[in-house]
C-alpha cells in the first residue's frame, strides 16, 4: 500500500466517522433539548410556586409557626427528585449547548448561564439563609423568634424571586434553542 493510498483510506475512514458522529449528534439534539427544557421548567415551577404561593401563605403565620414550617420544608426539599432537577438543569443545558448545533447554540449557552446563575443564587444566598435558620435551633429553644424570622424572610423571598426569574429565563432560552435546532 502506498502512502497516498493509506492517506486516502484514513481520510475516507475519518469522513465516515464524522458523518456517523454528526448523525448521532443530530439524533440526540431534540431529546436532549426536551429533557433540558423539562428539567428547567420543573425548577422554574418550583421557585414560582414558592414565590407566588408558599411564601405569601407563610407570611400570614405567627413567628413560631413560620420558623418551624420553614425549618421542616428546608429538610424536606433536600431529596433525590429536587436535587436531580436542581443540579440537572445546568448540566442538561450545558450538554444542549455542546450538542445542539450552531443555530441553537447561542440560546443554549444563555440557558446554561442562567441555570448556573440560579445555582449561584442558591449557594450564595438561599442555602446559607436556610442553614442559619436551622442553626437557630428548635423553635422551643429560640429566644427571639421575631429576630430569627426577620433575619431570614425578606432576603430569602427576594433571592427566591431572582431564582424564579433566572430559571424561567433558562427555560425560555431552551425553548428558543429547540425552535432553532436543525
Model-derived features with residue positions:
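A generic hydrophobic-segment detector
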Residues: 132-182
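Interfacial segments of alpha-helical transmembrane regions
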Residues: 26-41, 95-119
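Core segments of transmembrane alpha-helices
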Residues: 85-97, 164-171
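Interfacial loop at the N-terminal end of multi-pass membrane proteins
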Residues: 2-4, 8-24, 31, 42-87, ...
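Hydrophobic alpha-helical transmembrane segments of integral membrane proteins
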Residues: 112-133
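Transmembrane helix-loop junctions and nearby membrane-interface residues
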Residues: 48-51, 97-104, 123-130, 175-182
Amino acid at each position: 500500500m502506498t502512502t497516498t493510498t493509506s492517506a486516502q483510506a484514513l481520510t475516507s475512514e475519518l469522513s465516515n466517522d464524522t458523518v456517523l458522529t454528526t448523525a448521532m449528534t443530530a439524533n440526540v439534539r431534540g431529546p436532549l433539548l426536551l429533557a433540558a427544557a423539562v428539567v428547567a421548567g420543573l425548577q422554574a415551577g418550583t421557585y414560582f410556586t414558592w414565590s407566588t404561593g408558599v411564601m405569601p401563605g407563610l407570611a400570614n403565620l405567627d413567628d413560631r409557626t413560620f420558623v418551624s414550617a420553614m425549618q421542616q420544608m428546608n429538610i424536606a426539599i433536600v431529596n433525590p427528585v429536587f436535587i436531580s432537577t436542581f443540579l440537572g438543569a445546568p448540566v442538561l443545558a450545558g450538554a444542549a449547548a455542546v450538542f445542539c448545533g450552531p443555530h441553537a447554540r447561542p440560546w443554549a449557552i444563555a440557558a446554561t448561564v442562567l441555570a448556573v446563575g440560579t445555582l449561584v443564587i442558591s449557594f450564595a444566598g438561599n442555602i446559607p439563609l436556610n442553614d442559619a435558620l436551622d442553626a437557630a435551633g428548635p423553635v422551643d429553644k429560640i429566644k427571639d423568634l421575631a429576630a430569627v424570622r426577620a433575619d431570614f424572610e425578606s432576603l430569602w423571598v427576594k433571592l427566591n424571586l431572582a431564582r424564579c426569574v433566572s430559571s424561567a429565563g433558562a427555560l425560555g432560552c431552551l425553548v428558543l434553542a429547540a425552535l432553532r435546532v436543525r
